[in-house]
């Protein structure tokens, strides 16, 4: 029986020895290819001539040494034609050495080999350098359809090709929510507010709560610039789609947001804004709903702990209704509501009566907008009156509403 095994052993030993030899050879080749000297990496290529990765390492070492690397890259491409990164490098090499035709062919080969962002980004840059808009825009659009991370370089390249915001938006920007969000951020950063308007509208139509901060920031920029209708259109889109937890606004009717304090103040757009003030703390009571403030007496002598922008009609009369109660605050409290033109700061009404009542109390404030007023600012003001100390105690608010009067 033992003799019968001898022929099998005679066959197995050479095969095992051959396999062991190649394992050691390939391992040694891999070790050499990771050296810092191009000559050592080249020795690794001789030991594993069919390994594309080692050819790429050789090209890297030769480039680092300032030597020619294209032969190693061409060999790597022949061994691994599906490696898009190699084709991109060959394309850039060809372009740098005055062969645009070969450069384009290599970059197109890279795009066919990979459905990822990098080959299309390389193609878009190539066509931008060639001043070829007909080929640039499709490649920029393709790149953005699969892009991730920081997209500002793509947007900057688009604006270097054209200063026409409508053309850029139509040809380059895909209807991807994440891309629209990033492009809106880019336009705000560049202060291109007019170009941002259709982008904000497109984003608002598909927005999720994740996009809310970006769109509210856009609304704030519009309000700062006096573009109330543009801000209101985006705001109402978000409200109608329940991205914002509010009812839509109407300058001819419901122009106040969340008068019952059903949601936490968002601090932007047409929502309530709580000012971070030393000596003042604030919070929302969910049931029953009201907003409360506590004044320590160490707050600034004049401050506005709460405010909201109101989209109003020019030359119209309004009535603000509200309920409040106070604790440990005297009659001359220094607390009142103030309504002003958001652009000029001019007062639109006499201030409300001083807020002071230990029990819940209903009150109202009438005001009239100026002929050019389309945005008002409602603010809760707190100031130290002459001869008095600063306010110290508590204030609660609920049931605010705003109606347009005949």
Role assignments for model-derived ranges:
Residues 46-50, 81, 114-115, 145-149, ...:
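Short coil turns that delineate tetratricopeptide repeat
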Residues 4-30, 149, 171-406:
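Extracellular and organelle-lumenal recognition/adhesion modules and their flexible linkers in secreted
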Residues 63-65, 97, 130, 190, ...:
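Structural motif corresponding to the intra-repeat A-B loop/turn of tetratricopeptide repeats
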Residues 54, 86, 119-120, 150-154, ...:
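TPR alpha-solenoid repeat register
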Residues 43-44, 75-76, 109-110, 143, ...:
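Canonical positions in the second alpha-helix
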